[in-house]
Amino acid sequence: MLAKRIIPCLDVKDGQVVKGVQFRNHEIIGDIVPLAQRYAQEGADELVFYDITASSDGRVVDKSWVARVAEVIDIPFCVAGGIKSVEDASQILTFGADKISINSPALADPTLITRLADRYGVQCIVVGIDTWYDTESDSYQVYQFTGDEKRTKATTWQTEDWVKEVQLRGAGEIVLNMMNQDGVRNGYDLRQLQQMRAICHVPLIASGGAGTPDHFLEAFRDADVDGALAASVFHKKIINIGELKKYLSEQGVEIRVC
């Protein structure tokens, strides 16, 4: 059995790490490189960086900090933000990222997933899915351009259908960003994770809602996700990664303990 992964998420805007609640009202957390170093030292398995306004601004992620991060950490990291071509991806990977993640650009052009997978291999192609639970229809809907609350909009995709589609097109991993739970710290949406796990045959990463060590445990134990991504609990030092991994190991979760 592969070890489960603990993945801090760093949302980047204007060169700094920020964090919002339900993808809105972002506050500045701090500088990118020191935070990356801290999480690597605490025992994170990998890091994810989202340049959250790149797609809505029509630009590619700023590469200057990608190279700086690569110089100071020795764990894998993934970068997302406005990657719309094989050439964009090539630059990010050349600057030192281990994986690239696409979200809104994949919705605009699903063939991008296949082109990237064919060029670089599925192992480094992640598809991020921003999913919103609509209470009226009791359904999960895919959203795009979520980094800019003025431009955020629903797509025509149901989350379940998009999860199936991106796998067919070559996604090597899926990060499910559950917007209703984002930054609220009341636990991952286990029902949604279980529903998507049943149809997801590539690594599935839970994102949105972590507030306590037990929330991570529930995601691994009850939804069988491959990794759990979180931001505010790590940024604000509510949870220490090393202590979290020790707790999960004691509960029987297969995890790399520092």
From Swiss-Prot:
One GO location term (cellular component): cytoplasm
Pathway assignment: Amino-acid biosynthesis; L-histidine biosynthesis; L-histidine from 5-phospho-alpha-D-ribose 1-diphosphate: step 5/9
Catalyzed reactions per annotation: 5-[(5-phospho-1-deoxy-D-ribulos-1-ylimino)methylamino]-1-(5-phospho-beta-D-ribosyl)imidazole-4-carboxamide + L-glutamine = D-erythro-1-(imidazol-4-yl)glycerol 3-phosphate + 5-amino-1-(5-phospho-beta-D-ribosyl)imidazole-4-carboxamide + L-glutamate + H(+)
Listed GO biological process terms: L-histidine biosynthetic process
Parts forming coiled coils: none
Keyword ATP-binding: no
Keyword DNA-binding applies: no
Keyword entries, A-Z: Amino-acid biosynthesis, Cytoplasm, Histidine biosynthesis, Lyase
MF terms (GO), sorted A to Z: imidazoleglycerol-phosphate synthase activity; lyase activity
Active site: D11, D130
EC number: 4.3.2.10
Compartments, record wording: Cytoplasm
Primary residence: cytoplasm
Assembly information from the UniProt record: Heterodimer of HisH and HisF.
Annotated family: Belongs to the HisA/HisF family.
HAMAP family: HisF (MF_01013)
Protein's job: IGPS catalyzes the conversion of PRFAR and glutamine to IGP, AICAR and glutamate. The HisF subunit catalyzes the cyclization activity that produces IGP and AICAR from PRFAR using the ammonia provided by the HisH subunit.
Protein name in the entry: Imidazole glycerol phosphate synthase subunit HisF
Name of the coding gene: hisF
